[in-house]
A protein has these predicted regions:
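Extracellular/periplasmic catalytic domains that process cell-envelope and extracellular macromolecules
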Residues: 38-43, 96-98, 104, 146-148, ...
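Alpha-helical packing segments of well-folded alpha/beta enzyme cores
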Residues: 84, 88-91, 138, 142, ...
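Structural detector of well-ordered beta-strand residues that form the stable sheet scaffold
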Residues: 104, 154, 274-276
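Active-site-adjacent "subsite" loops/lids of carbohydrate-active enzymes
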Residues: 169, 174-241, 251
Length: 296
């Protein structure tokens, strides 16, 4: 019932009602016919690219104050190489000539990690494009420019974990925000535990809530506030940027009940949208669990 526009969100002391903090917020207008957007399908040719390794269109963002991981092209391993949104946009005509109809970049959200930040899979802010790639508006304009050439954009989403330098880590919203109460317990990657009715509960717990690495804290989506946050975050990016689809990293590693809620929430907003999830297993019975319409 809230109309688009700017307003202040006020936070008050629950006991006294005293105003503690207020945050200026802007609610954007939805695009016309947004809910009817079409996703990608078998007819599409998808280009998967790593933005940092693709093309450097704006050398001015190679070094950003406050970001430890800078461009070093002499390091062909984990260092950043300077590719950015401007570089992708400058090559849209080339991508179009190659016959691609969808672009799937690896994650471009802020990844302010000390090292190996180029890949993007350890986000430190879920609402901000990494400034070494460009701005949120740069990203939105890239999507629009691609659409004008008949090319859609698939966003790479990470629901399972964040980076260990995410600002949440300085002051957790709640003690159960992370798997294993914020203590590093490595997942054993036992993906079959979810489909094995005889699997030990401890093994299932470890798979869904164990950390991917010690620099990628696992998110505990059994926390209802976190679950709602992630759902709203995904819908916001679809609407704000004008996305054509989602590719979800480490899909099966998140809480299974949350994944069902997340997927149904997205499809409720966008019935014709397309989403695919990463599942490493080669066993059909394990992969089948995640197919649309599968009863589990």
């Amino acid at each position: 019932s809230v109309r688009p526009g700017s307003f202040k969100i006020r936070f008050r002391d629950q006991a006294t009602g005293r105003l503690r903090y207020q945050y200026p917020y802007r609610l954007l207008q939805r695009e016309p016919q947004s809910a009817q957007r079409k996703g990608f399908g078998a007819q599409d040719v998808i280009l998967n690219l790593v933005p940092d390794r693709f093309a450097n269109g704006n050398p001015d963002n190679d070094r950003i104050a406050g970001y430890a991981d800078h461009v070093d092209r002499s390091d062909d391993g984990g260092a950043r190489h300077g590719g950015d949104i401007a570089g992708i946009r400058a090559h849209l005509d080339y991508i179009q000539r190659m016959g691609y109809t969808m672009i799937w970049p690896t994650p471009m959200l802020e990844n302010n990690m000390p090292r190996y930040s180029y890949h993007g899979y350890a986000a430190t802010d879920l609402y901000r494009i990494d400034p070494r790639f460009g701005s949120n508006e740069d990203y939105r304009q890239l999507v629009q420019a691609a659409r004008q050439r008949g090319i859609g954009m698939i966003q790479d989403v990470v629901l399972n974990h964040i980076g260990s330098h995410h600002w949440w880590m300085q002051d957790m919203p709640s003690p159960d925000w992370l798997g294993f109460q914020g203590k590093f317990v490595a997942t054993r990657h036992a993906r079959t535990t979810l489909s094995d009715r005889y699997a030990a509960a401890a093994d299932r717990e470890n798979f869904s809530y164990g950390w991917f690495t010690d620099t990628m804290p696992d998110l505990n989506q059994r926390n209802p506030v976190l679950a709602t946050y992630q759902i709203q975050n995904t819908i916001w990016w679809i609407e704000y940027a004008g996305l054509s689809g989602l590719r979800v990293d480490t899909y099966s590693y998140s809480d299974p009940a949350f994944l069902a809620r997340w997927s149904s929430s997205i499809l409720r907003e966008y019935p014709h949208f397309s989403m695919v999830g990463e599942e490493w297993s080669t066993q059909p019975l394990v992969v089948a669990r995640w197919l649309r319409g599968y009863r589990n």
